[in-house]
Curated annotation (Swiss-Prot):
PROSITE patterns: NR_LBD (PS51843), NUCLEAR_REC_DBD_1 (PS00031), NUCLEAR_REC_DBD_2 (PS51030)
Name assigned to this protein: Peroxisome proliferator-activated receptor delta
DNA bind region: 70-145
Compositional bias annotation for Low complexity: 36-55
Subunit structure: Heterodimer with the retinoid X receptor. Interacts (via domain NR LBD) with CRY1 and CRY2 in a ligand-dependent manner.
Gene3D superfamilies, A to Z: Erythroid Transcription Factor GATA-1, subunit A, Retinoid X Receptor
ZnF start-end (NR C4-type): 74-94, 111-133
Family assignment from sequence similarity: Belongs to the nuclear hormone receptor family. NR1 subfamily.
Gene Ontology MF terms in the entry: DNA-binding transcription repressor activity, RNA polymerase II-specific; linoleic acid binding; lipid binding; nuclear receptor activity; RNA polymerase II cis-regulatory region sequence-specific DNA binding; zinc ion binding
């Protein structure tokens, strides 16, 4: 959704001031001591007051600024161009988008419309964005021979030849250490790992079998303490079962956002980013990460809830009235395909980190800094997959494609949430989720 004209103008003016400050080498703004987001207080969504925002979760003062002092516009989206990239004047976002698409051989779902690509919506249709890049003359050959700084040329060439002589690369030890750090952060911050979930689902874990929720009666039994006792108490009973299930989903989502925030803060260099960029990365990345991790607790028949003590059947969720019955089914379809890749928790840790540190999110300030962190994560992921899945030759490019699939899944989910907000007048969204969905795509 578009911002009100006055608000948008104020935001742009503030960003321009900060852009100048950064261009002049202004130091990164600092804030107070770090503090984690409190657990979700979820008594009545419609009465929540001053809830913790993404900014509160990060607990760092100040704000960021967009870089770049060029007046030249990006030929692709109209944002400020940062230079002459791959044959045309382009911004950092479109440069990175084109580079990743070519380098990672991504294929986007074909769009029959000719979407207008602008700064505010450039991530909405990746197919039309790439077609515009090509139509404007952005060149594949420019990746190696285009007009760009020598340092960047060397970096790209190194990336393109990453598969050659990996075992003799002096950075291998660093990549291993980096991967281990990310994995440890994952284990520390996420309560439900894939290993734990699959053990419960297959009955191999030394864990009481989950209580199966397959109809209204079993749901209310669960509400009386069989399953939900460890969740926040005080969720008011709603007469309509579909709305009640919807609110339970929000409870889980808000808690997972908290876990993801703590995980992100453990990723090397994340906390060195501008605060504005940290918030932006979380805003756009948390749902992609959530839906990727959701696959761990899903099988074709249903999903685990309440830390593995309950199991809600897929058929029961399908039986809810529309639009609530439409929310989860696309996630099941994605999860079944994603699980076929047979990733383990060490793979997922790096994959989730790569999702969060994505350099083409709308509104990012220091795109090169974010991309540099993601490049490190992707190199670590590729190397880790080669070691962990030596016979899965195309696993890395498949995961890169899954990142694009997740973005489309989240776009559709955000649009559905906005429709529910407008049409279901007696249904409220948690304020933190409202903040995330606002102006997303």
């Amino acid at each position: 959704m578009e911002q009100p004209p006055g608000e948008a103008a104020e935001v742009r003016e503030e960003e321009e001031k900060k852009e100048v400050a950064e261009a002049e080498g202004a130091p990164e703004l600092n804030g107070g001591p770090e503090r984690s987001l409190p657990s979700s207080s979820y008594t009545d969504l419609s009465r929540s007051s001053s809830p913790p925002s993404l900014l509160d979760q990060l607990q760092m003062g100040g704000d960021g600024a967009s870089c770049g002092s060029l007046n030249m516009e990006c030929r692709v989206c109209g944002d400020k161009a940062s230079g002459f990239h791959y044959g045309v004047h382009a911004c950092e976002g479109c440069k990175g988008f084109f580079r990743r698409t070519i380098r990672m051989k991504l294929e986007y779902e074909k769009c029959e419309r000719i979407c207008k690509i602008q700064k505010k919506n450039r991530n909405k249709c990746q197919y039309c964005r790439f077609q515009k890049c090509v139509a404007l003359g952005m060149s594949h050959n420019a990746i190696r021979f285009g007009r760009m700084p020598e340092a960047e040329k060397r970096k790209l060439v190194a990336g393109l030849t990453a598969n050659e002589g990996t075992q003799h690369n002096p950075q291998v030890a660093d990549l291993k250490a980096f991967s281990k750090h990310i994995y440890n952060a994952y284990l520390k911050n996420f309560n439900m790992t894939k290993k734990k979930a699959r053990g419960i689902l297959t009955g191999k874990a030394s864990h009481t079998a989950p209580f199966v929720i397959h109809d209204i009666e079993t749901l209310w039994q669960a509400e009386k303490g069989l399953v939900w006792k460890q969740l926040v108490n005080g969720l008011p009973p709603y007469k309509e079962i579909s709305v009640h299930v919807f609110y339970r989903c929000q409870c889980t989502t808000v808690e997972t956002v908290r876990e993801l925030t703590e995980f992100a803060k453990s990723i090397p260099s994340f906390s060195n980013l501008f605060l504005n960029d940290q918030v932006t990365l979380l805003k756009y990345g948390v749902h992609e990460a959530i839906f990727a991790m959701l696959a761990s607790i899903v099988n074709k028949d249903g999903l685990l809830v309440a830390n593995g003590t309950g199991f809600v059947t897929r058929e029961f969720l399908r039986s809810l009235r529309k639009p609530f019955s439409d929310i989860i089914e696309p996630k099941f379809e994605f999860a079944v395909k994603f699980n076929a890749l047979e990733l383990d928790d060490s793979d997922l840790a790096l994959f989730i980190a790569a999702i969060i540190l994505c350099g083409d999110r709308p509104g990012l300030i220091n795109v090169p800094q974010v991309e540099a962190i993601q490049d490190t994560i992707l190199r670590a992921l590729e190397f880790h997959l080669q070691a962990n899945h030596p016979y899965a030759q195309y696993l890395f490019p498949k995961l890169l494609q899954k990142m694009a699939d997740l973005r489309q899944l989240v776009t559709e989910h955000a649009q559905m949430m906005q429709r529910i907000k407008k049409t279901e007048t007696e249904t409220s969204l948690h304020p933190l989720l409202q903040e995330i969905y606002k102006d997303m795509y």
